[in-house]
Amino acid sequence: MLGTLFFDKQDRELLRMINETIDHGPSQDLEHKVFDANLHPHGILELTTTHEYRMAHAVINLLGNLEAGGAPDRLMALRILRDEVLHSARTPFRYNTGRVLIQIMKEIIRSRQDELTQLKLVHDFRKVTSGNPRLVRQFLNTYHLLEMPEEWNQLTVDHHVHDANTKGRKNATHLIMDAWIKGIRYITVVYYNYVEPAAARELLQAAEIMGVDVRIGLEFRTPFRDRFVCFVWAPRGFSDPEAFLSFLAERPMVALMNEGRKASLWMQRHVMDTLQLWNAKHAPALAEELEIPVPLLEPEAFLAYVGTGQTSFLHLAEYAHKTLLKHLVQRVKALQEEALTATSERQSQIAQLIRRMDMLTTEVIMETWLKPERNPELPSPDVPDNAPDTPELLRMPPHVLLDWLSCLRSGYRITLQLAELTAEDVLELLWDCQGMITHLELFNLKEWQEGHLRHLTAINDLQIAINKGSVLHLKQILRGMIRTLEASSSEKDKERCAKFRIILRNIPSLQAPYKVAPLRIRIGTDSTSHSGVRHGMGLAMPETLPHGARRQIARGKQFRPIYLPVSLSLEFRETYAEQERYSFFMRWLGPRLRRIWGFGHFGLRCTKEWRAISGITQIGEEGNVITMGGIGGELNNGLRAERTEKTRPRWLGFSRLSTPISNTLKVLAGFIPALVTFLYTQEWWVLAWFGAPLWFLITGLRNIPQAILGGGGMWSRSLLRWNDYVSWTRVCDSLLYTGLSVPLLEYFIRVLLLEDGLGLTVKDHQFLVFSIIAGANSIYISLHNIYRGFPKEAIIGNLFRSLLAIPVSVFYNDVLALFLPFFTTADPLLILEPGAAIISKTASDTVAAIIEGLADWRNNRRLRYWDYETKLQRLFDCYAKLELAFPDQDILSLLSRPEEFTRLTSTEARSLQVESIINALDLMYFWLYQPCAQQTLTSILRTMTREERVIVARSQGILSRVREVSQLFVDGLLGRNFARALSFYLDSYENYILTLNKRCAGFSNGHRPLLRRRRHISDCL
């Protein structure tokens, strides 16, 4: 029953392909099919596979390639994934749709063992691809994600996170993908002591792909008053990832990284000593307490578990928990069986023992046995040691270390971490380091939750006093510190008191470095994606989010953030700039219109931006910064959870019904109320029995020309047929809502309100009756347009369509009144009066076909602009690479001779040849198969220079090399199912090249024709 009623055939086929890939891994052919970044999601790839499967394949590869050697594959998967999700939505709701799609795909992969859950998720996935804002917002709430502005200008940050190369769980690509899903725009990934070039390359390239602003920070510990203080050094001023990697390869940086590796190895020795102590002391004691065998930890296996990360106590706690968990499960199962026949006293003991085992989580192991303070017999890595084996980096005073770092790069940010520091500590460090500290990590979510930031208010007051340049305020703070130190009997406090008196006499020297560049702040979560008791990464400023997200935060139902005690000062900026490319008409019209009042910004591109003024920050009870991540899991091992057999439900809800059944029910749900209403309200048998079918016929016929108009099919010469433009699901939706409108318009409005309530009839008040019915219809349609996620142009147009429908209704009424006497002897008014709603409906749908068709046309044009923007940029990038690869060749001339071009690139630039062919194939597919593509490209070509049009036209000539292009298909460029794509290419390339050449040649720069019509196109291009 479930197999026929619920889910579509496409759902099951997609799930089968996804699970095959999860179980067996991608084959070489599949890798070719998915992982060529130059193939556009809306290009020729559509002829071979669905974008849903390509997304799934990309996510599987991204999450599955955890080994270091898989970084190139992960990056390629990320690039493909981003292109797929950003080009999937059919509405302007692109970014939020993409975030939901990736999240659903991750859930599909995680639910591998539950086929029903997977089918539900696949069905949801295919629905969300429409980009309906209502559906997207619903799933954002489901997955505890905040809606982000489509301008992607939100202020969301996290300046302290870790990836798998330190103590985090996620590799760099996975981390960036999850940051993008959450909507984080600015992120700093912190590495301890050193960073491997391979890790930096993956992180920077992944961030570049996803458009995330990422910085790499190196955390160093330095001794300060019998403890370590931490600094995060983030060099800056790099134009691209390669510039940063070149900086890492410089000799001074290599020396620093070598010293950093020594410091990390020193920490690793402490962790390994703790591992040995666990084996010798803690494991036997725990085994005796829990009455289970606690396995000893193998050092080699533990280091293999850490992998590319830097060994830490957190890794050790997780590894100990992992090795222990299976024994806990077995022991709990045995105890539960024993409890069935045990005495009540023994049952109480068993329950207590099971509770103890259930609470033995990673966090408990860490806090109870592995923290340095829990093992006083071992030297603590948190206490400075001047022993000979202590690395030099861990013995340097703060000012010496910072002086070394500042000499390596002129542009840098050095952030002081404030865990367990007082305002006196911060002041002394600022004085010692003489302005080299540029930022304070004023808020760290992990340290705050652990109670290590007890002096934030005093530190914040000190920062404000320094940044304001207020000598009086700073002097008051200093004098208060001196009074406190004077009251202490400690020798160290007396020594510090003398130092503070020196600072008091030299306040201008303390302020001087921060007059030009104020002492700024950083906020972060210190997220590792490991612990279930900590909030995940991401901090947001609600003022920068859309209204829906702010309402979601205020409700606090599915998304319950923490308001942090940090208030940032924000500024909002709008920048208007001229478009990069204008048509000749816009170049002439724009400046003239902008002189008129109210049109000052006509034709200008508006950029909206939020910015935090980090030098002005207040610490208080509740600020304007919230957490974006939730707590990862429960604080137990799940051993006490009752395991019940999952029964397959008989009913999965209307949203899970298969598309044919769902569409049938929609039509019936609309038709039955319409039929009943006409039978009840109409006396003439024709309208009583045929009014509802006529009503539906009007709507159905209206949707077809509307879809063709929206797809641009009336003017293009594409390969699309008329039914390719029509979405039958959308037609069924229209029939549902139009059927429900019959009781509204015919019964409640015309009969109850107008006739019975106000005494208004078509016979006596023709214009007024039609106006009221049309107005009610417009409001009703606009409301369900919003619900269905229609373009805003259609929604706004439908609000005003009653004004246009009124004269059309009167016209139709007069025409029918004129012609009805030829078909019947009855009074025409006796027929027209009960048919007023039908006439109004016909007029309204006539106007709607034009309004919604034009709205769909504008939406399709917007989608094609996105497609062409991406593909033409790649085409020109490829051309630039060719010019650089062959500096002695005239590439523009060579493109006009495809045979010579392929001969040259086959031997010296094979990858660029393949890229050129892919670009040409995608552009040909756009032209012949995508709605509104031909009109859109024509508009774009009109804004290009002559040279750019020549490049576009000549680059398509490579399609004439049938042997080379066909060989790519055979070699697996598009996977195994390439027959349809190859047939399309062979049938279409000649006419396409000729047509595009003519189109490119048919423009003029200024008033002169680009090419004379008598000259042969191929000679000119």
Task: Please tell me what each predicted stretch does.
Residues 1-186, 195-256, 262, 335, ...:
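Charged catalytic cores and adjacent phosphate/nucleic-acid-binding surfaces used
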